[in-house]
Design a protein with these regions (language model features):
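Class I (Rossmann-like) S-adenosyl-L-methionine-dependent methyltransferase catalytic domain
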Residues: 1-58, 62-116, 130-217
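Conserved acidic residues
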Residues: 119
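A conserved beta-strand element that flanks and buttresses the S-adenosyl-L-methionine
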Residues: 122
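Short catalytic micro-motifs in class I SAM-dependent methyltransferases
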Residues: 125, 129
């Protein structure tokens, strides 16, 4: 297994970096199941009658447990994007009925907003994996990929780390970043994190700034 001390933040921009982590089994971010806060959010969407044809993106999805759960609930337009091929192949084996065309081995930052527009983008350990110098690019790309009434929803680490991924942060940093591009509907301590992450996660819901009186779920 690769020694974490040998990893540099400059490597995270390369597909080979992430492929090697999967090849070596160095996937400490993978909890082996749907993240409970995101499962609860998906169930909230179902309870509120959100269309199962909603366009949903999960970037940097890895083994994509959330995408699998959405698929099981009948959502038909879920897209998974990851740098690495292996987790996408594994996902396809676990969910043979999932549309192969929706499994994208690609650079999130290279997705064309003219081709892809989403109602929901779900953040789960992608933001903390990118080079911190690209966080503004992340926010800009999210803004471009979301429909006017779209939502960016997910989890952020409320904790600082060393120079290797995961790259953490805190609520104030995230507010400063995201309020430039979005209306912050929710950014609060997560009450239903898995035990190892309790007290170190923030749950958030962001919407496009120009939309007034939009739904907040």
């Amino acid at each position: 297994m690769e020694d974490n001390n040998t990893l540099t933040e400059h490597s995270v921009n390369d597909a080979e970096f992430w492929q090697k982590r999967y090849d070596d089994g160095y996937t400490g971010w993978d909890i082996g199941k749907v993240s409970p806060p995101l499962q609860a959010y998906i169930e909230h969407l179902l309870d509120n009658g959100v269309s199962k044809s909603a366009q949903i993106l999960i970037p940097g999805a890895g083994n994509a447990y959330e995408a699998g759960y959405l698929h099981e609930q009948g959502f038909s337009h879920v897209y998974v994007v990851d740098f690495a091929r292996l987790p996408l192949d594994n996902f396809a084996k676990r969910y043979p009925s999932f549309p192969k065309a929706h499994l994208l081995q690609a650079d999130f930052f290279g997705l064309d907003p003219a081709q892809y527009q989403f109602d929901y983008i779900i953040e789960q350990t992608f933001f903390c994996a990118i080079d911190p110098s690209r966080r503004s690019d992340y926010a800009k790309q999210m803004q471009k990929l979301l429909k006017p009434t779209g939502k960016l929803v997910g989890l952020l680490l409320d904790k600082h780390f060393e120079s290797n991924p995961p790259f953490g942060g805190d609520k104030q940093e995230y507010e400063t970043l995201f309020q430039q591009f979005f209306t912050i509907n929710t950014l609060a301590p997560c009450y239903n994190s898995i035990k190892p992450r309790q007290g170190s996660e923030l749950f958030f819901i962001l919407s496009q700034k120009k939309v007034q009186n939009a739904r907040v779920f």
